[in-house]
Amino acid sequence: MDHVKLVNDPIDIAHIHQLLADAGCGASSVFVGTTRDNFQGKKVVSLAYEAYDSMALKEMNKICLDLRSKWPDLKHIVIYHRLGTVPVCEASVVIAASSPHRSEALESVSFAIDQLKTRVPIWKKEIYEGDHVSEWKENKESIRPKRSKSAFNYAACPCKVEESHDVPRTLVQIRVNDAELTKRLECFVNRKRDEINSQNVIDFKSSFVNSDIDLSDSCARTQSTIIKQEQSNCHLKVRRVNNRCGPQQMEMRPNYELELNKLMGSRDGQTDPFKEMRKSLPNSRLQAIESYMCLTTDNEENIFSRIKKVENRLLQLESISPEYRHFTKLEPSSMELPPPKKIRKKSYSVPELSAFIQKIKEGSEFA
């Protein structure tokens, strides 16, 4: 019988002998690995063991199968390994086997301990006395690679870096000093914090419309309430998001080239852009931009104020989305049915109903 186990308590050697006992066996071999008190001249206090439990037990059972295939006469096999902290002189691993003859027992135990060190994923850390640094390490006999074979060896390829403070201006994206950059970051964080606070007030704070409580000093933290949403396990309102620029909307996106040609004053349908340009050559480019930005055009208005309106429109579009208007403006799909119109039913009074019934009766008599 095979006895395989990872234990956190001290291993009882007497219990191991009981597991090996069998009337038909004339020999039992037991290997006990203990914690020694020194390593490379450093004082060892204890050993700490960790393992990948499921994989370790699987490999230990495979070792038992290998032992029985090589030595079929083996009766009982025991493989116990400690996990956690193991003080000095305590057993950390016990491997034992019983068989009718001593040669099978001795050879199988020697083979098992070598396979355990090689195949089972168990790591240990030596805890030293004093300020010596401890680290986790695997058995040196392990067949698992310590590092990827395809990893690049940076130590074999030294790289010399020449320090230079003259950086080309084309490679610099942010051309401000540290104080200005810190100020911008603080403003961004504060604005995001204000948005979150305002949303928390909307989602959590009740209005207390009919209450006489003074709310001048109240806040969302002290006045918050949780309102159960219908057909939902969440107390926050769930809103459907219309993803207008996702991958599923590729077919509904407009023709970018056509939109850009409109912006540049190219030919569009039956209109002649050169004819329009000859009519008002100084304002043609600005008029095209204003038309594309959906701004009202007034030729008598000052050109600087018109340019200012265009700049404000661009800033507005950039604040809404990094993409511009012609990237997100979608044409209505012909496959989609128009939303049903809400029809409000008319309420009839009693005299109106009586008059309507009377008309029906008169019509039937006439027929």
UniProtKB/Swiss-Prot annotation:
InterPro entries: MoaE_sf, MOCS2B_euk, Mopterin_biosynth_MoaE. Keywords: Cytoplasm, Molybdenum cofactor biosynthesis, Transferase. GO terms for cellular component: ATAC complex; cytosol; molybdopterin synthase complex; polytene chromosome. Its EC number is 2.8.1.12. One of its GO terms (biological process) is chromatin remodeling. It holds the Pfam family MoaE. Gene3D superfamilies: Molybdopterin biosynthesis MoaE subunit. The keyword Phosphoprotein does not apply. It catalyses: 2 [molybdopterin-synthase sulfur-carrier protein]-C-terminal-Gly-aminoethanethioate + cyclic pyranopterin phosphate + H2O = molybdopterin + 2 [molybdopterin-synthase sulfur-carrier protein]-C-terminal Gly-Gly + 2 H(+). GO terms for molecular function: molybdopterin synthase activity. Substrate binds at residues 101-102, 117, 124-126. The keyword Transferase applies. It is found in: Cytoplasm. Pathway: Cofactor biosynthesis; molybdopterin biosynthesis. Its main location: cytoplasm. Catalytic subunit of the molybdopterin synthase complex, a complex that catalyzes the conversion of precursor Z into molybdopterin. Acts by mediating the incorporation of 2 sulfur atoms from thiocarboxylated Mocs2A into precursor Z to generate a dithiolene group. HAMAP family: MOC2B (MF_03052). This protein is produced by a bicistronic gene which also produces the small subunit (Mocs2A). Belongs to the MoaE family. MOCS2B subfamily. Heterotetramer; composed of 2 small (Mocs2A) and 2 large (Mocs2B) subunits. PANTHER family: MOLYBDOPTERIN SYNTHASE RELATED. This is Molybdopterin synthase catalytic subunit. It comes from Drosophila erecta. The lineage of its organism: Eukaryota, Metazoa, Ecdysozoa, Arthropoda, Hexapoda.
